[in-house]
């Protein structure tokens, strides 16, 4: 389905990465998904990532949930990308910890595309100023694009306008003259199990899929 949606959006199937969201799933379930071909997995919580990390087979880990500055140092050498940067303060902490570890961390800026008070992420109008501030001051961070979680809707089609709006913001970033060593704007992380086909049609390059891979979560 992801591949068909990619073709509908005028792209090749390999242009879209399927990320397995492993929140509340066991190490065995995650390893089964890796055996079945999963290359990228996303965790929402730092503690959960750290508890599973030693026993999961080699894979590309992403942090997709809210990240507190005091937890950055715990994951800086374990993830390939942080999808949820929503402040200069957080970006600067990532920059500091990445510098200490001798690496450059890829990040996405999380946009609160529905302006929901209950969600983290920045407002659309703050995106360009924030990216300019980060690329101007953080040499161990590379901005790769944006991530959004649209307001919950009953039907996937309800998310389309939010995905289209996020894609426009992503394209605005691509037009900016940013330092090439600090920004490669190529990643649009949007779409989950319920609406990923619509997200891919609207240009997503990473879809975050949990229940469509693992079945319903085991809420303990």
Describe the residue ranges of each PLM region.
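Conserved alpha/beta-domain cores
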Residues: 1-194, 200-202, 214-216
């Amino acid at each position: 389905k992801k591949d068909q949606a990619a073709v509908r959006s005028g792209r090749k199937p390999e242009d879209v990465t399927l990320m397995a969201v492993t929140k509340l799933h066991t190490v065995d379930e995650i390893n089964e998904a890796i055996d079945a071909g999963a290359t990228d997995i996303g965790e929402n919580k730092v503690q959960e990532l750290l508890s599973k990390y030693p026993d999961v087979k080699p894979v590309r880990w992403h942090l997709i949930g809210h990240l507190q500055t005091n937890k950055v140092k715990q994951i800086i050498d374990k993830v390939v990308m942080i999808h949820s940067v929503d402040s200069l303060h957080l970006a600067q902490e990532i920059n500091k910890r990445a510098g200490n570890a001798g690496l450059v961390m890829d990040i996405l800026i999380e946009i609160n595309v529905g302006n929901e008070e209950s969600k983290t992420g920045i407002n659309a109008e703050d995106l360009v100023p924030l990216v300019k501030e980060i690329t101007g001051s953080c040499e161990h961070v590379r901005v790769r694009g944006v991530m959004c979680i649209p307001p919950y809707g009953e039907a996937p089609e309800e998310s389309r306008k939010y995905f289209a709006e996020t894609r426009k913001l992503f394209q605005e970033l691509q037009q900016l003259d940013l330092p090439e060593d600090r920004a490669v704007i190529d990643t649009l992380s949007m779409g989950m199990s319920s609406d990923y086909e619509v997200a891919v049609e609207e240009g997503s390059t990473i879809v975050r899929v949990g229940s469509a891979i693992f079945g319903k979560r085991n809420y303990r």
